[in-house]
Amino acid sequence: MDDTDLQILSHLQRNGRLTMVELGKLVGLSSPSAAERVRKLEDKGVITGYSANICYEKLNKHVTAFILMEPKSCKHYAAFATSHPDVAENHRITGMYSYVTKVVTESVHTLEDFIDTSMAHGKPTTLVVLSSSSCHPAF
């Protein structure tokens, strides 16, 4: 993987809807060359898919929180989190807690409902997001 591949990844991460013509111009390649590089990155499993960034507030989900969970059973908590509609992400982690769960919900009341329900699976510690900044991993 060379610097051009890293540039391609960076541009696609910011805007996965770029055309190959636009991407080629951004990285100094012809559109067929850019398309070939993208195809190779997909074939190697470096690019695993494309997704949309969602503005949750437009969906009436105004509260984001991270739940640090000490579950009674990792298997049961993972099943609970995976099936809950307010869970955007759930990660198994090391350290004092076993999971960090990103919850996006309508209000503090629905967050409280989630916390109360999650207590059947262990001990949650809740961190409410006040603001966020857009970040992209550096390559």
From Swiss-Prot:
One of its GO terms (biological process) is response to amino acid. GO terms for molecular function: sequence-specific DNA binding. Residues 1-62 form the HTH asnC-type domain. Keywords: DNA-binding, Transcription, Transcription regulation. Residues 20-39 bind DNA. GO terms for cellular component: cytosol. PANTHER family: LEUCINE-RESPONSIVE REGULATORY PROTEIN. This is Uncharacterized HTH-type transcriptional regulator YezC. The lineage of its organism: Bacteria, Bacillati, Bacillota, Bacilli, Bacillales.
